[in-house]
A protein has these predicted regions:
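Sec-dependent signal peptide cleavage junction
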Residues: 19-35
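Short structured motifs
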Residues: 30-32, 44-50, 105-110, 122
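Short strand-coil-strand connectors
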Residues: 37-41, 87, 140-143
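Short, surface-exposed ligand- or partner-binding patches at beta-edge/loop junctions that are enriched
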Residues: 120-143
Length: 143
């Protein structure tokens, strides 16, 4: 079971690196293969893990740095549209608690207002169909 989770994470990382390389086409600067540029914002993929959601199901949790390069404060939640797919089907969001006493979830950082030039770590969680099939994530800037 642990070995299949490691394979899934490797496949996810490969998919995100491919996505980020396509997103950054045409730029002259040295490229970080985990950096995704979305207009006024940048996402830096930091990793993924499988956690248990509030109902005991397997969920994938992506960790990203969200940088606001715009001129006004912005939050990840209202700036980035994310889609996560597995087996050709869009995955549902998952509720993964970090503190059951306060009901804090892994996605709390998405609500943080980020000043221009600042960066905040965000996480996002989705219910997995299985722990062996690859997962593909795409990100777009909200217009």
């Amino acid at each position: 079971m642990k070995q299949t989770k490691i394979k899934l994470l490797c496949l996810l990382l490969a998919a995100l690196m491919l996505l980020s390389s396509l997103t950054a086409c045409g730029k002259d600067k040295a490229k970080d293969s985990n950096l995704i540029k979305l207009g006024d914002y940048e996402l830096l993929y930091k990793g993924a893990c499988i956690m248990e959601d509030s109902d005991g199901n397997d969920a994938i949790v992506l960790t990203l740095d969200f940088t606001n390069n715009g001129k006004e404060n912005a939050s990840y939640l209202w700036s980035v549209d994310e889609t996560v797919m597995q087996n050709g089907v869009e995955l549902e969001t998952a509720t993964v608690f970090t503190d059951y006493d306060t009901f804090e979830t892994v996605i709390e950082g998405q609500f943080t207002d980020v000043a221009p030039g600042a960066t905040v770590e965000v996480r996002t969680a989705y219910l997995l169909q299985d722990t062996t099939s690859p997962v593909e994530a795409t990100f777009e800037q909200f217009l």
